[in-house]
Amino acid sequence: FWKLKPTEELYDLSADPDEVNNLAESSTHQDKLKELRKAQQDWCREIRDLGFLPEGEIHSRSQGTTPREMGLDNNTYPFETIFAAASIATERGEGALPQLKKNLGHGDSAVRYWGAVGILNRGMAATAASRDELVAALEDESTYVRVVAALALGKFAKEADVRRGVETLVELSNWSPQMDVFTSMAALNALDKLDAKAAFRLDAIKSLPRGGGASPHGRYNGYVKNLVGKTLSDLGAAPGKKK
């Protein structure tokens, strides 16, 4: 379920209610694909969909107002710019790599985030070609950019950069009054995806706080504890579990 998905999916729900046969590449379904693609994009534009922001940025950008009001303000949410960056990131063409690297230097953090996501989605070759940009992104002012850059390096880079990525993710997983819950959740999810590559920081992961950090609402607070437990379990180090 959590594996990388196709850029687009199209199903004939009458003939294929279980959505097994993806028709997005079918030559006989291209007109319908284009029709539905336009409908989906038009709807995103009409509602100025906030889902193109990392969850924590929805909260940080809407401080002093509501998410809806923030989303209607092009100064706080330049929708078309961010939407274009997300669209490029979720395509698979290698020809987009120069633009993705350029997006990593953009002034808006969400555009930088999608630049990093696009490189991550393209795997080892794209990560190697973007190594310098990703290492620089480990110091980005946006923690969400840092998480994705660290995951790309941790997953696809050479050993020294894998260690850089893991160290960054452990640091960002440290939920505290200075580290918001959404950053810690994103970093812990990324650590969990690295599996054994994160094992050299097992003791640090064991000591991560499970509560007490910055959070806009208590309903989010249980996730950090669960994610730490899941990561430790996958590393064979959950309480009471034999290695």
What residues fall within each predicted segment?
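Long, internal low-complexity/basic segments
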Residues: 1-7, 13-15, 23-132, 136-169, ...
